[in-house]
């Protein structure tokens, strides 16, 4: 299952990629938006990323104007490794070397044909493991270290507005 998300700017490209997923017979869940009305990309990047992080979806494809804002939002969710790609080489290596579990595309940056090629190659690429697994593990340790920091999500004081340390 592939999680999908977009803001209004990314919606037309997301709809084109949905056609590609259907052609390939791949299951997906669309976390929105489904409207061309202006919306905030962090909402939809987070929803799709949380589905991937929870294991409800194996990978995610997200879209906004540049791919940058929605990828930044997704990458705040622990366990997410989202990359912005506008070329096939980076897309393939993001899977092979970095085990990227989400791909962000900018609808104002890549055209439909290039986006289809990027998505196809990203979906087909396989994580190589080996020395790359060690590096991905190092990235995960950095993430875990910051989650333990005061004020992080595991800190009970972080849930109490106005409380200072």
Kindly give the residue locations of the regions a language model identified.
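Acidic, glycine-rich active-site loops and adjacent beta-strand->loop/helix elements
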Residues: 34-35, 65-68, 76, 88-90, ...
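C-terminal binding/interaction regions
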Residues: 3-5, 9-10, 88-165
């Amino acid at each position: 299952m592939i999680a999908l998300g977009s803001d209004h700017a990314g919606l037309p490209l997301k709809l084109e990629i949905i056609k590609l997923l259907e052609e390939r017979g791949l299951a997906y869940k669309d976390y929105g938006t489904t409207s061309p009305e202006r919306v905030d990309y962090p909402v939809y990047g987070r929803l799709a990323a949380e589905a991937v992080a929870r294991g409800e979806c194996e990978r995610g494809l997200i879209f906004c104007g540049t791919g940058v804002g929605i990828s930044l939002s997704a990458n705040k969710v622990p366990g997410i490794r989202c990359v912005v790609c506008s070329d096939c080489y980076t897309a393939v290596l993001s899977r092979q070397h970095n085990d990227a579990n989400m791909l962000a595309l900018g609808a104002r940056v890549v055209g439909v044909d290039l986006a289809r090629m990027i998505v196809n190659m990203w979906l087909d690429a396989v994580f190589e493991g080996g020395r790359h697994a060690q590096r991905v593990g190092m990235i995960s340790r950095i993430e875990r270290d910051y989650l333990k920091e005061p004020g992080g999500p595991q800190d009970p004081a972080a849930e109490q507005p106005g409380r200072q340390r």
